[in-house]
């Protein structure tokens, strides 16, 4: 082993060694001052080697760890699989509930996270129930298990998904009620049978009172400010409107029917003047008996166009109104034209183009016929 000279030893090491260790002689006579510097130099070299190894480890180790932590190359065309699951209660997954740790083993942070998760799940469940609720179905929660939701089929078809209250207002399933008018009737308990019965009763009463469907629409417009067409009234009587519109229109027609019934017998009543229907009632259809009709037919064959005096005599004979007899003759002539359309347009056979009649002397038709009849046997 080579011992470096004293000139190569740092002065600090030699000074520290001389200060810290006392000078003594060993058994060979060599002083300790010559041995201690070599000892410190050896330890100094060892420390330098350890520092270099540590630096090498610090450089190599992060590189290896970084290589190990480097993300693997993703596979091509690998589609992520997303699974959407609605949040359920613990009773829906008992095997998962058993695997969860008991509550007393949870730390405060874990308990807070679990509480937040439960709150978010409950809010999502509420939002899901609100979104999935539609007007065409009803939601029912059982008393024993409020977390169970049952869907019931609607009693009406999808077109009939509305309900009415006492004021005739219409609202959707679960929506706020909006009053249509101040009229009140028993439309809260309205059902298809009630609407059908009311429509049939309304049609019978309207015809008996002599009002047309157009008259009813105009009257409703004058009373309530919304004129309904004749088609709407016709569709109501035929039950061709939706349940919502039937409920809207029923209280209006119910009120109009009460007013019309209360003013029966007074042709110029206040109700008719207010609705503008005075003098516009439909006249009842006249029914003529069979024997009276046969007498009228006899008079028609004798004279198709009677004058006013003859019409009056026929009316007195048959005990009919003069207007009824006049209208009957007019209708009978129209019927005759439909049966024989060319009868009234073709000229009379005994008339010329100038309108003067032809007599037998001017047109000896029979003599010509006899002449040709007599000549035919001679030719044979």
Curated annotation (Swiss-Prot):
A cellular component annotation (GO) from this entry: nucleus
The UniProt record lists the keyword Nucleus: yes
Disulfide bonds: none
Keyword set includes Nucleus: yes
SUPFAM superfamilies, alphabetized: Homeodomain-like, lambda repressor-like DNA-binding domains
Stretch forming the signal peptide: none
Annotation: DNA-binding region: 281-340
SMART domains for the chain: HOX, POU
Compositional bias of kind Low complexity: 1-25
Name of protein: Homeobox protein ceh-6
Lineage, highest ranks first: Eukaryota, Metazoa, Ecdysozoa, Nematoda, Chromadorea
